[in-house]
């Protein structure tokens, strides 16, 4: 399962770096870790956001890993706004599954979302 391999890669990053760094460091480390878990990915993927068929603009998602959208956070705890934001990105992207990974907590926080 792709999500299980993404989570395994994320756990390795968290185990190695621990909490306390900025998001970009976890993004870079995850980009280094994913290929070792046999995963193909794109980083900083732009998605179009539409309203009633009209394009409103674009948003950037942190990763798309084999059709799974992945958002990275580095906060003490995931807040409702983070969950809602990730769910909105997932709906806008058209992907079916998303992961919200928070590396800032003492233990890696993982939220799986479905569209």
Question: What residue ranges belong to the model's regions?
Answer:
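Arginine/glycine-rich "motif VI" loop of SF2 helicases in the C-terminal RecA-like domain
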Residues: 90-96
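A short acidic/basic microdomain associated with nuclease active sites
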Residues: 37-50
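Active-site-adjacent loop/helix micro-motif of nuclease/hydrolase catalytic cores
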Residues: 76-84
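Interdomain/boundary linker segments immediately adjacent to catalytic/signaling cores
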Residues: 1-17
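Domain-level recognition of nuclease-like catalytic cores that cleave nucleotide substrates
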Residues: 1-2, 82-83, 97-115
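N-terminal, polar/charged subdomain of small-to-medium soluble alpha/beta proteins
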Residues: 58-60
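Nuclease catalytic cores
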Residues: 3-4, 19-23, 27, 31
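Conserved catalytic cores of phosphodiester-cleaving nucleases, focusing on short active-site segments
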Residues: 18, 41, 62-76, 89
């Amino acid at each position: 399962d792709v999500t299980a391999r993404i989570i395994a890669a994320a756990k390795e990053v968290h185990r190695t770096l621990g909490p306390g760094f900025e998001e970009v460091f976890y993004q870079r480390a995850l980009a280094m870790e994913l290929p070792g878990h046999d995963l193909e990915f794109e980083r900083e993927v732009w998605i179009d956001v539409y309203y009633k068929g009209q394009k409103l603009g674009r948003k950037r998602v942190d990763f798309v890993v084999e059709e799974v959208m992945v958002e990275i956070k580095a906060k003490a705890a995931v807040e409702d706004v983070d969950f809602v934001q990730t769910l909105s990105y997932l709906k806008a992207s058209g992907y079916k599954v998303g992961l919200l990974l928070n590396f800032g907590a003492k233990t890696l926080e993982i939220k799986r979302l479905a569209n």
